[in-house]
Amino acid sequence: MFRQSKTIITKLTNLSFQGSWRSRGSSAVEKALKYTVGQKIHNFTVKEVTAVPDLFLTAVKLSHDATGAQYLHAARDDSNNLFSVLFRTTPMDSTGVPHILEHTVLCGSQRFPCRDPFFKMLNRSLSTFMNAFTASDYTMYPFSTQNAKDFQNLLSVYLDAVFFPCLRELDFWQEGWRLEHENPTDPSSPLVFKGVVFNEMKGVFSDNERLYAQHLQNKLLPDHTYSVVSGGEPLAIPELTWEQLKHFHATHYHPSNARFFTYGDLPLEQHLQQIEEEAMSKFERTEPNTAVPPQTPWDKPRMDHVSCRPDALAPDPVKQNTLCMSFLLGDITDTFEMFTLSLLSSLMMSGPNSPFYKALIEPKIGSDFSSSAGFDGSTRQASFTIGLQGMAEDDTETVKHIIAQTIDDIIASGFEEEQIEALLHKIEIQMKHQSTSFGLALASYIASLWNHDGDPVQLLKISESVSRFRQCLKENPRYLQEKVQHYFKNNTHQLTLSMSPDERFLEKQAEAEEQKLQQKIQILSSEDRKDIYEKGLQLLAVQSTTQDASCLPALKVSDIEPIIPYTPVQPGAAGGVPVQYCEQPTNGMVYFRAMSNINSLPEDLKIYVPLFCSVITKMGSGMLDYRQQAQRIELKTGGLSVSPQIIPDTEDLDLYEQGIILSSSCLERNLPDMFQLWSDLFNSPRFDDEERLRVLVMMSAQELSNGISYSGHMYAMTRAARSLTPTADLQESFSGMDQVKFMKRIAEMTDLTSILRKLPRIKRHLFNPENMRCALNATPQKMPDVAAEVERFIGNIAGNRKERKPVRPSVVERALGPEAGAAATRKLISEAHFKPCQMKTYFQLPFNVNFVSECVRTVPFTHADYASLCILGRMMTAKFLHGEIREKGGAYGGGARMGGGGLFSFYSYRDPNSTQTLSAFRGGVEWARAGKFTQQDIDEAKLSVFSAVDAPVAPSDKGLGRFLNGITDEMKQAHRERLFAVTERNLIDVAGRYLGIGQQTCGVAILGPENESIRKDPSWVVK
């Protein structure tokens, strides 16, 4: 997977920390503290042992005696153990060699020579995460699992893959690039470029924001590895040879150039022994020549320009330009300076109280900040970028002037103390909040700094940095202003990069690709052509052969826990509103949710619900204007959010609950403040500021438009499903292409008064305690206080309570659970007369890849066949569709899955094909109906399904399934038993009965470039 350099990797405020989950007599944390500096363990030497109480862990730093490999172990009482190995990969061209290598090492190794052990292990393990990332200057291979045996299995596969890969030429052709006949079996069909990474990168550069971010980095840091595209520039990829790939592996994938990281409660000695025996003992030290030198600073600012494709869904078609100024900062190994600059970046541009928000967003010059804006600590020297997307070309000079003026204003005025406190409170919340994938977050958080020989342990001492930051401010009130003066005002290493759409952009890309193709073809001899044809057949034969994977380790179905852990909840009520209390070790946090149905909302207002949800917490309430409200939310909570929720019934596909969910969290001490903020939103929301609404509408429309090229498969699945169930129909309105186009129309309106007037009407129906139920997760000690505060909150909002008739008369009541009491019911809408119908929709978009989906209406969650369809989807993906769609078809991804709403969905992602992929979906059904699978295939599919079913759940989210969907632990256990019981006969039966042609109604949708054959086919609706 190509990971673009962005703040996701190192930005502190993106890391959700996780508190101690379990108490033990002798915990992993305590045991690790007993290691001593200089201690030898399996040819590793302990260099440092550090308690990190902020994160409830002990950090043990080691180095390997023979190779010098660096090792960090984070011992913590968390059963979701993680391993990661990182190599510094610094390419000097844009052929994508580190990215193609990342794909190819996972295609088979010395001990595990079968093709594609990585994808095969997804189905032979209970992993909670398995992947690999190529960043600008490193490649990382992480996995996590809760099962100790599984950890050892995966560690063996990962170590062998990275250090002893086969790197077969056939795998290079498949994963990287190749010249091949369009139809490999027909030598008269034209020669074309194929390859998984080749198509993936074409898809990446279909996304204007990704394109811009890539150029920004290349041009800001032009001296060394950051001047090239590590993921591969599509037209440079065909310059890479197999020999160059093997050479890059030999020079970069060595323990002397590696950083190992392990996390969790498994014993460190065990990891070290296995790593030493299976990999390290076979190597000697080398001197890797992979360091990135500092960029030579410029003596004057530079400007540059880049072109992109037009955006058919842009909120304002005449405002499609992007302009940013990017400043090169200091070395990321200076952890405290980077901590300060990361906070400074947030103060400068996060939220409506920040100076750049006021200066750039509120005047409505652009639709939003560029997604490249902010602090980026993923390269050796960090950078800060500020600028806009969705702006007019004429405003270029204005924006430059505003940025310069705002920097001057910050130097003159600084920041309010309350803004700084709000930001430090955010850090405190994130240190308390518990995520389920903390090991992975930690591995990503330290990756860039450690990659450049910084101290990863220092980076984890967050409280120390906060204290030092406070001290610096105390000693020098102009501390931050002086940083702004130094890094922004006086910094000559700054780049101004503009981007504008070119109507012929995709056409020019296609022409350039054709030109590159012809260059390659023209130099081919008749021998070469014959060779290409034969190699194409050879690859196809290998792809079509069932692989013997018996060399790979695997868990057995008997390794899966037969019984789920029970989550106790206490039902109650506050002021007549049902409340679910769930006592959990939340580490001093309180989590609040409320579900409110929208059954009484008039039909004409329904399409506005997502807009209402996105603006209601951002327009002010009570005595607070929107700026004061934002400040208060930051100071007292982990955020307030409102989002639409459509929940299918577990027994009937024509029943569903429609509503909104309110979510927030806070530190225990701020509980009254959090509920006061909600009370103000219920009692006195502000709907009087049209200018504020316009800003929010533009940002929302831009975000939706930007998201399509990244999440195209989700939009395709949502659209394909819309005509199959009432739930899916409403889902398309709320979160599909219908909503994207609706928001574009609103963004184009010159007068939003009519929209503004609708918001109070919607609020009366949505913020009605009569339709509400609440859920709270907190520590047992705090729960009495929580109950009292909820009671007070419901009392405060009682004036909004009104019994309103549902718009649709057919309402079915379902109890929330056996012990919830008569009052606690969910009011579901019944559409018994809904008629599913066949529909094929094509969205023509300026992309150069497709997103394809087909959906079939099947059965609800509690139906006896639901479990079989879950197993079938996973098995079909691993054993048939992966080979057809990715290996042969060249798409980045694809598969099939069973959804909770009773829909069986096929999909492909960044796919060079369109209707051919629909044929592959059908082929998958025929493969299953013919029973062309083994008991081993079924067992592997079960392991894969259970790894998702048993994924860790954070204390903040325990009991949510029951609260939202009415799915009790008993129902989960029954589903579990049905999954265990699935047989070959069941799978053949459900494939024929539900997925066979003509058996059930299906819907199809494709998002992709212009397609002449579909346009001429009357069975398709072209949008």
Swiss-Prot record:
Cofactor (UniProt): Zn(2+)
Family statement: Belongs to the peptidase M16 family. PreP subfamily.
Cofactor note: Binds 1 zinc ion per subunit.
UniProt binding sites for Zn(2+): H99, H103, E200
Protein name in UniProt: Presequence protease, mitochondrial
Compartments (UniProt record): Mitochondrion matrix
GO BP field: protein processing; proteolysis
Gene3D superfamilies: Metalloenzyme, LuxS/M16 peptidase-like (3.30.830.10)
Organism field: Danio rerio (Zebrafish)
Keyword Manganese in record: no
Cysteine-cysteine disulfides: C114-C551
Active site (record annotation): E102 (proton acceptor)
Gene name tied to this protein: pitrm1
Summary of activators and inhibitors of this protein: Mainly exists in a closed and catalytically competent conformation but a closed-to-open switch allows substrate entry into the catalytic chamber. Substrate binding induces closure and dimerization. A disulfide bond may lock the enzyme in a closed conformation preventing substrate entry into the catalytic chamber, participating in redox regulation of the enzyme. Inhibited by metal-chelating agents. Inhibited by nickel and zinc excess, and slightly activated by manganese.
Main location: mitochondrion
EC number of this enzyme: 3.4.24.-
Listed GO CC annotations: mitochondrial matrix
Subunit structure: Monomer and homodimer; homodimerization is induced by binding of the substrate.
Keywords linked to the UniProt accession: Disulfide bond, Hydrolase, Metal-binding, Metalloprotease, Mitochondrion, Protease, Transit peptide, Zinc
